[in-house]
Amino acid sequence: MRAVVLSEPGPAENLIVQDWPLPPERDGWVRIRVEAFGLNRSELMTRLGLSGDAVTFPRVLGIECAGVVDAAPAGSGLRSGQQVVAMMGEMGRTYDGSYADYTSVPLTQVIPMSTELPWEVVGALPEMIQTANGSLTIGLDLQAGETLLIRGGTSSVGLAAAALAKQLGATVLATTRRPDRLGMLKQRGIDLPIIDTGEIADEVRKHF
């Protein structure tokens, strides 16, 4: 298979597309045919050599992916060709990640899904949704009826957080520095879009 392999930390030129062994079938692991993957800052840090001793080389980077099941353990409930996403859990760090035609990850990291969205869209979702959802549920324990202010509301994580917060029943305020984005925030269900001048406390207090 093809893979983007980082032989050692350094410049982007150290990332080389080359032939790489197909991950073998393993008990408790799922082999995924990768259709798309997002690019993450942590991968940049690894490429620059800033991930410490956790990463060994050569390594196929990539901490998230979207694709279809190629091989799964018996009794896993997953079937060949099923759409899935996977992320984190040392993926692309202590074992090869998603910068390849195929990757193999522990079953516990695989999330089945079904969508008609194009792969290039789905590939950007796992880490974005995980970051937003974890912030709202684990970090904030956001409850219905509460009010949430999102700085940087037009970013991918900001938009994801807003959508999830609305599903939880929260009132959502979101900021943007661009007046032409206010309409977009309103269309996304934001209760109060705010222009971020760097000093938004007074604007928020006008309404709450």
PLM region spans:
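Mid-domain Rossmann-like dinucleotide-binding core that forms the NAD(H)/NADP(H) cofactor-binding site
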Residues: 125-199
